[in-house]
Curated annotation (Swiss-Prot):
GO terms for cellular component: plasma membrane. It holds the Pfam family RDD. It comes from the Bacteria. InterPro entries: Pra-immunoreactive, RDD. This is Uncharacterized protein YczC. Keywords: Cell membrane, Membrane, Transmembrane, Transmembrane helix. Its main location: membrane. The chain crosses the membrane at residues 12-32, 36-56, 85-105. The gene is yczC. It is found in: Cell membrane. It is a multi-pass membrane protein.
Amino acid sequence: MELAGFMLRACALLLDVIIAAAVILAAGFTFGDGSAGVIIVAILMLIVYPLLMPLTNWKGTLGKKIIGLQIVRDETYKKISFPQAIVRYLIAWVHVFSRLIYLTAAFTKKKQTVHDMAAKTIVLKAE
């Protein structure tokens, strides 16, 4: 399995942002701006979706699936656990305050970000 580099991961993240924005925007048109429906959809897209999708058979978000990436356990390449997903998710939110966290993937041997190292996960190109 080949490790996924910074650019592929950045493309997957960009796709996920576009997908989330489109879904939230559609919810705004459907439910009306600021409605409970929009808030629920936003919570689902910004919290639930990126937290739980790595636990599915896709092993990642739709953006990662489209680019052909999977989030797996570092040592075994198997599906990650819920605690690992939580660690990845919480640490990944640091990028909201510092986009530099993703640059570690460009400089580490296993192309890992800080949240990958903390959760003991890696991102691979899907076969």
